């Protein structure tokens, strides 16, 4: 991973299989259930599933082995892993990973 290039993935929310979303860790599914707006819930589930798939390809480790969280500003972080970024707008979600430093992605 140390010399890996930046990696980007994107998806339409409607195109992500339900199985990918249902395979997320319980804590992430529970957080999604706390969103009142269905669009926001679907964006969150799609973003997490897409990010975990990207991290699996990027690191070679199982998708659910990555400990994801947020920094003090709400930006997603992967404990002990690459720098990550998530963006969503309407029905599109994008994720990015970089070997070190910071990364930002926007739609």
Predicted segments, located by residue:
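Core catalytic alpha/beta fold that binds nucleotide/phospho-ligands
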Residues: 1-107
């Amino acid at each position: 991973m140390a010399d890996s290039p930046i990696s980007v993935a994107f998806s339409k929310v409607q195109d992500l299989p339900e199985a990918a979303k249902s395979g997320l860790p319980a804590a992430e599914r529970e957080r999604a259930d706390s969103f009142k707006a269905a669009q926001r819930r679907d964006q969150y589930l799609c973003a997490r599933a897409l990010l975990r798939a990207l991290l699996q390809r990027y690191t070679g480790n199982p998708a659910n082995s990555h400990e994801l969280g947020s920094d003090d500003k709400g930006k997603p972080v992967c404990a002990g892993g690459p720098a990550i970024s998530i963006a969503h707008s309407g029905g599109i979600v994008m994720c990015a990973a970089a070997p070190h430093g910071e990364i930002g992605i926007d739609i």
